[in-house]
Amino acid sequence: MADHFDVVVLGGGPGGYATALYGAAAGLRIALVEEQRVGGTCLHQGCIPAKALLQTAEVLRTVRGAKEFGVEAGEPTLDLRASQLRKQQVIDRLTKGLETLLKGREVTVIAGTGVVVDAGAHRVRTGDGTEVEGDALVLATGSSPRSLPGLDFDGSRILSSDHVLEYEEPPKRVAIIGAGAVGCEFASMLADIGTEVTLLEALPRILPGVDAEVSVALARAFRRRNISAHAGARVTSIEGTRELSVAFEGPEGATTVLVDNVIVSIGRSPRTAGIGLEESGVDLDRNGFVRVDGHMQTAVPGVYAVGDIVDTPQLAHVAFAEAIVAIKSILGEDAQPIQYDKVPWGIYCHPEVAFAGLTEEQARERGYDVVTAVQRFVGDGRALIIGEPEGIVKIVAERDGPILGVHIVGPWATELIAEGYLAVNWEASPEEISTLVHAHPTLSEVFGEATLALTGRPLH
């Protein structure tokens, strides 16, 4: 007979563990089924390890530029194995902390690969036959790297994001297929550690989801760093074994580059196959994502889905928010649906990119009478002091109305976006933000200056 809980959670990544922690904080008895250590892709193969290696790249870049500040440090060398060790120490510390937190809230963590055997009864079975059921079931099985037809990941020639995060020696030359957030982060990191990078994007510009002016600014910065970025590029062939010949066609014509590895970075697929969902009546779309309503509930009453298995932004903080909505819905509380077009995004390449809300193009497509302001970091005292004056803050607003979107490319953009997100989420007007005092000298002043510009009375 299956053990009974208030909520059974299948999957221990950000969506799953957030569901468990928030539910337990609300007094619910929770079972969490996870096949590996808790933490999921974000903690073990995504956000945390990637940003740890990007921080290594930043330190290397900073030391190389130390002479500009009058600091003689010589030419630095990189021990990537030591960097990987530090990365793993960060992961282990966070994982242990998460395990301790789950234990402290009395969440029952069950090790094993779970399968839904009866969605109506909210029952899950693991490989050793253990069964648990609940008054509600939350699906949070995550995602895996998506490959291209004929380009199966082999760990030597064709690499996924998982493989890239395990490099022990910097490759000499790579081609990266896909210039979205992850592709641009990899391009930036590898260029910093000495790799010759060719970045290929099939759509008309790199970072195709961001505002066009931000994309152009990042492409310009990449060119200055000798990252060979090609938008509108279609890969026509990949040949060879040890040395790979990558042929592609783009606006510049047909080109071939020789590389050591090809990194495929075109997104992630939901892990929904083979876990009993369709057999249980859980509705999936043609790409395998679970269909949910605004309260994260599936077609089966009492069964919810959160995180990467839902066709929403595949971001850990979005999974956290979805987990809260799911638990509030289970408790019968007022759970406001998430406004996905307003959530903040952070891309940790150099220079960093961050945004929240609508791009200028999206705002115009939705019929807004749009006004914009662009303020450059080159005029900001703090940006010049830290030696990173490249980039812009762009604000998209409705004429005589609220701020619709904030888009940043430049130093510490992933931290600066917090103020932009609050402005977008609270539908603040440029006039309201322009009355706020920004400390000087700070990078945040650039955002304040942009709001002043939208009032028609810029200060600088």
Regions from the language model: what does each represent?
Residues L10-G15, T19-Q36, I48, A52-V59, ...:
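Flexible, glycine-rich terminal cap/loop adjacent to redox cofactors
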Residues G127-T130, V235, F248-T256, R268:
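A structured beta-alpha segment of the ubiquitous adenosine-cofactor-binding alpha/beta core
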Residues D154-P170, T256-G332:
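FAD-site-proximal beta/loop scaffold in flavoenzymes
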Residues A2-F5, L21-L28, V33-P170, T198, ...:
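Glycine-rich flavin
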Residues A20, A24, A187, A191-D192:
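Gly/Ala-rich phosphate-binding loop of Rossmann-like dinucleotide-binding domains
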Residues A2-G13, K172-G180:
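Beta1/beta-strand and adjacent pyrophosphate-binding region of the FAD-binding site
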Residues V8-L10, G114, V132-G142, I177, ...:
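Short hydrophobic core segments
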Residues G16, G183-C184:
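N-terminal Rossmann-fold NAD(P) dinucleotide-binding loop
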